[in-house]
Amino acid sequence: MVNIAGGATEGYFYPSDMQALNVPFYAIRGHLSTLITLGHEALAARAPGVSFMQVFPGAVRTPLFDQTPGVFGVLVRCFVAVAPRWLFVPIEESGERNLFFATSGAYPAREGNGKSGVQVVEGVDIARCVDGNTGSGVYSMDYDGTEAGQKIVDLLKQYREEGMVQRVWEHAQEVFGRITSLD
């Protein structure tokens, strides 16, 4: 399962504000990326035959830039118009990379003997997961497939030890329960 969001950008997590209603603007990306990754860990524990990955797509030139309203939108469009092409990942290339992530055997689920996905060829290694091991089923990657660094692995280990995976799962269950309630 590929989630296009903020892979390899995990950061400080605010467990008392999981919805990020009061998280400082500068910390939102790290908080939400961590929330997603911890959620993936909770899902992987319940579905060990599925691999979960969060990928940061990089700056992809899309129509979203054209639809940004107001003064900020004008500034964004001016920047995009004059920005060098090398600042952006072409949309086709982004799609190709994410298709690779979704189908490659380099990102196996926790269970399944590494037999899922397209068989890796010589020279392609099994990716390192967010727990620091290979093949444990939860991945966080930058746009080019670079795995989350050791600092992020250590941070997520700390959150795991503090019981945050379970807290994120309970929060998600509470939110889904509230949304689907007939009351």
What are these regions (language model features)?
Residues Y14-D183:
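NAD(P)H-dependent oxidoreductase Rossmann-fold/reductase module
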Residues M1-Y12, V55-G58:
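SDR active-site strand-loop-helix element
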